Amino acid sequence: DASFSFSLNNTSTQSSFNGTQMKEDKTRASLDQMGFVYTQKVSNRNLLRYVNFGFGYHKSKNFNRLFSMGGVLDGLSQSWQLSGDLNDAGINGTDFDNILDDKNPYGAYFNREKYSILSMMALRTGVVDWNPEYDAEYKGEDNIRKIPVLGWDGERNNFYSEEKGGISEYDFSIAFNLGDRVYLGATLGIYDVLYDRFSSYTEDLIGYQATDERDNRIYSIPVEGDQAVSNGGYTLDNYYRLEGSGVDLKLGAIIRPFEESPFRIGLSVHTPTWYELTETTNAVLSSDIMAFEAPYQENLSNYLTPLYLTYDYRLSTPWKFNVSAGTTIGGLIALGAEYEYADYSTSRLEDLEGFQLGDQISVEKFLNGVSTLRVGMEARIAPSFSLRAGYNHSSAMFKDDAYSALAVYRTSTDFNNVKEKDT
């Protein structure tokens, strides 16, 4: 026997931000599965009746998604957050000038307790700027003079993300029929992983220009009489790729305990999937801010070797256990129930030498055991018409206090979390 199937996958998302509605809609064709089974009859009398050999391909995960959101900012801007990061880190004029002028500041001045990568990129592109009124010794009531680095007010923003890829699984199977009562099977699975994510965040900025004889510059903070003017903007592009391969083994049995009954019990165990993966990241911050004479661009790959932007590691998923039961009634109704459990806190993260990674502590602390319950029924109403209904409940993989701990040189801020859900 041989089979294959195609599908059309439609991705549609909608967003609302400060009164602005946005929608993304895209349809892609996909080869979801194909396979064949060769059956060898052994005997009608012996315990072993049939041996089946199979090969299958299916796309176990499809990552294709689109999302966009944007609207009016009313003065809010990420640039103020980035200037706040620098100020909170205790930046001074010397460090500001060194970061601005250094050929590669991301190694010399960066550490987790000082300046973030993204805030330094913002400094070098004018997304934040030194406050000319700053006075470290000032003790008066003008708070602006106490702030070393300033941001810009925002007018509008736009966020867009596109995800591509999937997990393709290639299965090599063998199964045995023992007396038409017990069915045993084993499957070797080989996985091909590819996930690409591109996200882009843009802000249009506002500046303030003097209407008197003061000068013609554009300032971050207005004084009385200044007028708001368009001040250009900036775009932060983030690139992320995950690729690799994996292997696992699945063992299962279906048992018919009663010879004259269609009732059956299923048991299966899946070994961990052992993955070897590579993550690659990059970020580009481009600005064209009217307060400055020229546009600027910072591309991390121009400063950092692949050693900093590429990460190789091994991941092993948890053991997975499954029990199921099903039967038919009168040849018209089929009933089934299934329970599955996997403890994701037992997942393992190692480097290519087999040593445990530092993130392993977070895996054990923030991941849960996941229980999945599925029940379903199908009723044949007419020879060519059936009704099917089902219920699926999955508990949350992440604990409530889990957070996204990005790699050092990741500047993306989007976060995905699978909560408890029913379908």
What is each model feature region?
Residues 1, 25-26, 44-45:
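Short secondary-structure boundary/capping segments within folded domains
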Residues 1-12:
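Transmembrane beta-strand segments of Gram-negative outer membrane beta-barrel proteins
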Residues 32, 37-423:
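Outer-membrane beta-barrel porins/channels
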Residues 10-27, 242-244:
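Surface-exposed strand-loop-strand hairpins of Gram-negative outer-membrane beta-barrel proteins
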